[in-house]
């Protein structure tokens, strides 16, 4: 069953469970994620980053959509950390049910403007949108770094951002970071910040 992120997270939030998100851009990884999710009867998010998107063909995404649609388990097909409107539209045209517009490194008002533009377009075709405020560093699979550049999410920005953009869910920064943590580095997770954001956030 292929659904969008808003539908999945509403159920998860109501029933207090987490949903795993797994990057899978080739068939063996994709099959592993789907088969294990089905074996556990667990909803899951299959996601692709923009840098990985073009490694697969449109035929692959058609296969992915068909496989997820025919499953008895709910799945979301999600673009992770899209940086531009064009990247998000490309994913929507390929049949993704959810996209992320990550404008967290932009000035706040520019992040709002860009995220709202994507949200308005995506909602026309039933695709959900994730936004981000606060930053978790530069995404990297090979370099140690990014972890010293965390900008924590300000709870006071959450309601304003969601109201102005209309996003369906929100990525926040509470101390985790992209990339490989340097040896000896211990992330400082601000769980009390997470609780404060949860109290005021109108979306998951």
Task: Report residues per predicted region.
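Terminal accessory/targeting
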Residues: 9, 13-21
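Alpha/beta enzyme core
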Residues: 3-11, 25-51, 58-76, 81-204
């Amino acid at each position: 069953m292929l659904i969008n992120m808003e539908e999945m997270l509403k159920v998860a939030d109501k029933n207090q469970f987490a949903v795993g998100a797994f990057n899978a851009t080739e068939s063996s990884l994709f099959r592993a994620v789907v088969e294990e999710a089905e074996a556990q009867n667990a909803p899951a998010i299959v996601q692709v980053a923009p840098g990985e998107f073009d490694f697969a063909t449109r035929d692959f995404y058609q296969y992915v959509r068909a496989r997820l649609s025919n499953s008895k388990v709910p799945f979301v097909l999600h673009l992770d950390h899209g940086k531009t409107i064009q990247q998000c539209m490309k994913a929507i045209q390929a049949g993704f049910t959810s996209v992320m517009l990550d404008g967290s490194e932009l000035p706040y008002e520019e992040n709002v403007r860009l995220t709202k533009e994507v949200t308005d377009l995506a909602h026309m075709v039933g695709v959900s949108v994730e936004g981000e405020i606060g930053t978790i560093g530069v995404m990297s699979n090979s370099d140690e770094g990014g972890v010293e550049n965390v900008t924590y999410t300000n709870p006071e920005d959450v309601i304003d951002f969601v109201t102005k953009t209309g996003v369906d869910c929100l990525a926040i920064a509470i101390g985790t970071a992209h990339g490989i943590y340097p040896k000896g580095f211990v992330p400082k997770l601000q769980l009390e910040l997470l609780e404060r954001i949860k109290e005021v956030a109108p979306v998951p």
